């Protein structure tokens, strides 16, 4: 629901103003092993791939993935405690957190009990690669959809280059096991940025919950239990046109082709199509760069010879 109590149809809700406020304590256990402890009134637990807006493979794409609530919707959790141990190419993380999704009021803090938990394992086989597997139990995450969720994800990310000349790709699979059924999602996305120009793409297959997409034209009842996937393919491009004092402005456009299951075709048709034309404005990145692929419980600097958190000015 939005702030006026209306259902969200064909769009994502905006994120809360505060997405991460965290205190991080790191200590070296020896030359190759580190321990990290994080406490955050708002932040991300150890669950899912790097959130979509922080992935280089999705940085130019202005649209949230359809599978956001199967992979990384917990990145704004109001109450998180995470502990992590990293050694060489490996990092293991565990979290307890408030599993409830933020409400429709975007300017406040939605604190709650630390009633959910998760674990995540990272492996960096080479400088350009990072793999993760994670699982977590979310207690009553959705106000309008009572029930608990066990979420499991696996993903692989690749990044080559630096600055404004890079190529990136991410592939992921996720599953939500709910009290009333199971939903799966998969995505493949990539980006190539060179100089002032960038191109990007994303393919998704998501087993949607029809009730979340219902309009007056969609039949209620058995349709709400459909597990046929929605397919989506997006292709787009962006060009930087403004630059000054660290600010970056770009114009871009993309188009998305869909294939919908039969239960949704009365409202959406068999092959809906959408497009964006947009202007993107980025503030100065600071001395650390944009730090794409960063996460809240990042390993200590120097404890891995193969970091994926490339600085992107």
Can you name each region flagged by the protein language model?
Residues 1-122:
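Surface-exposed coil loops of outer-membrane beta-barrel proteins
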Residues 42-46, 65, 76, 97-108, ...:
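Sequence/structural signature of outer-membrane beta-barrel proteins
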Residues 1-19, 135-145, 166-188, 195-233:
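Outer-membrane beta-barrel translocator/channel fold
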Residues 235, 269-313:
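Outer-membrane beta-barrel "beta-signal"
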Residues 31-35, 45, 85, 89-93, ...:
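Repeated loop/turn-to-beta-strand initiation elements of outer-membrane beta-barrel proteins
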Residues 37-41, 85, 96-98, 133-137, ...:
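Transmembrane beta-barrel strands of outer-membrane/channel proteins
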Residues 15-21, 75-81, 86-88, 113-117, ...:
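Residues that define the transmembrane beta-barrel architecture of outer-membrane proteins
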Residues 21-27, 81-87, 94, 119-123, ...:
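Residues on the lipid-exposed face of transmembrane beta-strands in outer-membrane beta-barrel proteins
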């Amino acid at each position: 629901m939005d702030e006026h109590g209306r259902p969200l149809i064909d769009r994502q809700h905006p994120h809360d103003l505060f997405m991460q406020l965290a205190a991080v304590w790191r200590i070296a256990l020896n030359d190759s092993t580190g321990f990290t402890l994080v406490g955050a009134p708002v932040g991300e637990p150890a669950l899912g791939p790097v959130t979509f807006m922080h992935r280089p493979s999705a940085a130019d794409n202005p649209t949230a993935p359809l599978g956001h609530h199967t992979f990384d919707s917990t990145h704004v959790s109001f109450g998180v405690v995470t502990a992590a141990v990293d050694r060489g190419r490996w990092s293991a993380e565990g979290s307890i957190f408030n599993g409830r999704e933020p409400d429709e009021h975007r300017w406040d803090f939605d604190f709650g009990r630390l009633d959910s938990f998760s674990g995540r394992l990272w492996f960096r086989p080479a400088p350009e690669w990072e793999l993760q597997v994670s699982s977590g139990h979310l207690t009553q995450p959705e106000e309008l959809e009572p029930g608990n969720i066990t979420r499991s994800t696996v993903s692989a990310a690749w990044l080559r280059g630096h600055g404004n000349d890079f190529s990136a790709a991410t592939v992921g699979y996720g599953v939500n096991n709910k009290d009333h059924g199971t939903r799966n999602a998969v995505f493949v996305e990539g980006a190539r940025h060179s100089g002032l120009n960038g191109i990007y793409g994303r393919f998704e297959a998501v087993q949607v919950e029809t009730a979340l997409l219902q309009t007056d034209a969609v039949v209620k009842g058995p349709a709400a239990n459909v597990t046929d996937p929605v397919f989506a393919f997006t292709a787009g491009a962006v060009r930087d046109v403004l630059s000054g004092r660290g600010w970056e402005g770009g114009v871009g456009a993309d188009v998305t082709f869909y294939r919908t299951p039969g239960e949704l075709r009365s409202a959406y048709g068999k092959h809906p199509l959408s497009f964006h034309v947009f202007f993107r404005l980025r503030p100065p990145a600071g001395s650390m760069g944009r730090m794409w692929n960063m996460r809240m419980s990042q390993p200590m600097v120097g404890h891995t010879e193969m970091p994926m958190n490339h600085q992107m000015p």
